[in-house]
Regions:
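Conserved catalytic core of the tyrosine transesterase superfamily
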Residues: 3, 7-191
Length: 191
C-alpha cells in the first residue's frame, strides 16, 4: 500500500467539484485526517464554537473523551479558507463541515472523495479516510516519535492499539536498534 503524504492529499482533492467551497472543504477534511491523525467522526464533529483555530485543536474522541492535538499550519489555513468560502451561516454549536444542501457533512461523502483520490493517484484499494490516520501514525514513528506520544495524539487508551497503527518495517527497527542500543553501537560487543 502506498501511504499518502501531505503533498498528495492537499493537491489532489480538487477533482471532486467545481464549487470552490466544496474543493476547500474537501481539502480541509483530508488535511485534518492526515495532518492531525483524526478519525473521520472527529473531523466532522468540529464545532463552529472552536473557531478560530489556534496551533492546537480540541477533539472529542471515542467515549466522549477530549484531547488537545497540534494542528499543522497548512491544515489550519485550509479550514480558515473553507470557512471564508462556505455559503451557509453557522451558529456556535454547528459542525463546520457542511454538505451541498447545508446540513452536516456525511462521512460517506469523505469516503467517496477518497475513492476518487485512489483512482486519480493510483492508490491501493485500502487507501481510505482511516488509512490517512494510519499514515499519520506511521510517518510520526518513522520520523522518530515515540509510541507513547503517538498514542496520546491518536487518543488511544491502549498502547497495543497504537502499535497496530504503526506499521514499522524491519529495516527501520534495525536502524533504530543499531543507533540507540549501547552495545549495538560498539559493534555488537557485550563487554
Amino acid at each position: 500500500q502506498r501511504q499518502m503524504c501531505i503533498r498528495d492529499s492537499s493537491s489532489s482533492v480538487d477533482l471532486t467539484s467545481n464549487e470552490p467551497w466544496i474543493v476547500a472543504r474537501n481539502t480541509a477534511v483530508i488535511l485534518l485526517l492526515y495532518g492531525c491523525g483524526l478519525r473521520i467522526s472527529e473531523a466532522l464533529s468540529i464545532k463552529y464554537n472552536d473557531m478560530p483555530l489556534t496551533n492546537n485543536l480540541k477533539v472529542k474522541g471515542k467515549g466522549d473523551k477530549f484531547r488537545i492535538i497540534p494542528i499543522l499550519q497548512i491544515a489550519r489555513e485550509s479550514v480558515e479558507n473553507y470557512l471564508k468560502l462556505l455559503p451557509f451561516t453557522l451558529d456556535g454549536n454547528d459542525n463546520i463541515f457542511r454538505g451541498v444542501r447545508g446540513g452536516s457533512l456525511n462521512p460517506r461523502s469523505i469516503q467517496l472523495i477518497m475513492k476518487l483520490l485512489r483512482e486519480k493517484l493510483g492508490l491501493a484499494s485500502n487507501a481510505t479516510p482511516h488509512s490517512l490516520r494510519h499514515s499519520f501514525a506511521t510517518h510520526l514513528l518513522t520520523s522518530g516519535a515515540d509510541l507513547r506520544s503517538i498514542q496520546e495524539l491518536l487518543g488511544h487508551t491502549s498502547l497495543s492499539t497504537t502499535q497496530i497503527y504503526t506499521s514499522v518495517d524491519s529495516a527501520h527497527l534495525m536502524d533504530v536498534y543499531s543507533k540507540t542500543h549501547p552495545k549495538a553501537k560498539s559493534k555488537n560487543s557485550l563487554n
